[in-house]
């Protein structure tokens, strides 16, 4: 774990608690565990809650306590919280099953991926990883029927008024929420920084029909595409959601034996996602317990871009409790992820948007008054640290 020695002690314990797979992974950790003071344990607890890793960290700290005998002041409280989280996840899973059964009954082919699928295939325990949405991917030609079914189940669009509003803005998915607190992300494309809206056939070629042992209806991504997708998700969120890096690491560990490395590299080439996975693997190599697949993916000297990304994405920048400004986050994502050409295009789009781009931003026909309003809104988002989307402020 290159550079691990320079990481502060409470962060070291948090990172091990994210990566431990068995009680024995805490052997030899008595000294760093004892070095964490009360404030440090509170910090670890807050990180676990903020990144949706409360259950995983609580279980693994329980192992640490059992294996080393070191007292962990926040463990009892985190264990109670983990039980409460389990009840929430059971409710979300019930809602997801209702959605899956309705789509299946209508003969609509769909893929369940991200949080819900990772809990089944990687974590194996609903209490370990929190998720908010049920993410499903459908064929574009079946999008409207799938949307209608979700409406019939009581789900409504969370941001725009109609599905067409998402389509004209070149979105890849739409979030829909229910009065019972559940929500679903309906996707018709999968994309990343360097990957435009995906050719559906490429995605479907790497998905598998449901198996009888699955807890939920719906197709699943192959192990190779699952690993790629969690890396893409980490990148798309400009490296702010640390849970996605943990997803990547644990997917590599748990599904590594089923991943065809040649097929993985071939798919990375087709989707233009090699750099994305390379950076995720190098961060895992730095922070987590060594793993053969991670080492293979991070082998060789890093590219100039990967070297720059890893210098920017330090443990302190990734494990921060305060939210960074949206524009600051976007700039970090562009510097760390985009190729030179795409980064230049993105910076131009941010600083000098074209008429069509402003139309998509404002949702109406272009007029010159959009330019001053665009810069005022962006300045407010930058200096006001607001988390609201542009459309809510325009």
Positions of predicted regions on the chain:
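Conserved NTP-donor binding/palm subdomain of two-metal-ion nucleotidyltransferases/polymerases, i.e.
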Residues: 2-132, 138-394
């Amino acid at each position: 774990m290159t550079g691990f020695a320079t990481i502060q002690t409470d962060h070291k314990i948090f990172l091990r608690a994210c990566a431990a797979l068995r009680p024995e992974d805490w052997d030899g950790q008595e000294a760093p565990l004892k070095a964490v003071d009360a404030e440090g344990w509170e910090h670890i607890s807050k990180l676990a809650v903020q990144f949706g890793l409360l259950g995983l960290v609580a279980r693994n700290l329980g192992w640490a306590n059992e294996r080393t005998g070191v007292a962990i002041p926040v463990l009892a409280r985190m264990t109670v919280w983990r039980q409460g989280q389990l009840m929430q996840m059971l409710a979300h899973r019930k809602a997801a099953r209702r959605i899956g059964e309705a789509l299946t009954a209508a003969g609509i082919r769909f893929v369940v991926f991200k949080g819900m699928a990772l809990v089944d295939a990687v974590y194996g325990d609903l209490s370990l990883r929190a998720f908010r949405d049920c993410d499903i991917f459908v064929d574009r030609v079946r999008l409207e029927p799938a949307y209608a079914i979700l409406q019939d189940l009581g789900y409504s669009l969370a941001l725009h008024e109609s599905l067409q509003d998402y389509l004209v803005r070149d979105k890849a998915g739409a979030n829909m929420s229910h009065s019972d607190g559940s929500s679903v992300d309906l996707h018709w494309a999968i994309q990343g920084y360097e990957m435009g809206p995906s050719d559906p056939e490429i995605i479907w070629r790497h998905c598998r029909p449901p198996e009888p042992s699955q807890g939920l209806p719906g197709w699943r991504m192959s192990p190779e595409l699952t690993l790629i997708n969690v890396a893409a998700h980490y990148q798309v969120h400009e490296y702010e959601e640390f849970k996605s890096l943990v997803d990547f690491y644990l997917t590599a560990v748990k599904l590594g034996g089923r991943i065809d490395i040649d097929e993985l590299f071939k798919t990375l080439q087709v989707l233009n996602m090699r750099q994305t996975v390379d950076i995720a693997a190098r961060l895992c190599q730095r922070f987590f317990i060594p793993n053969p697949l991670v080492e293979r993916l991070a082998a060789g000297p890093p590219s100039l871009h990967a070297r720059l990304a890893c210098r920017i994405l330090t443990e302190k920048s990734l494990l921060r409790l305060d939210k960074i400004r949206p524009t600051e986050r976007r700039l970090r994502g562009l510097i760390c992820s985009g190729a030179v050409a795409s980064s230049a295009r993105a910076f131009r789009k941010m600083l000098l948007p074209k008429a069509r781009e402003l139309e998509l931003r404002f949702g109406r026909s272009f007029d010159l008054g959009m330019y001053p309003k665009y810069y005022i809104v962006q300045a407010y988002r930058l200096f006001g640290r607001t988390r609201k989307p542009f459309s809510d402020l325009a």
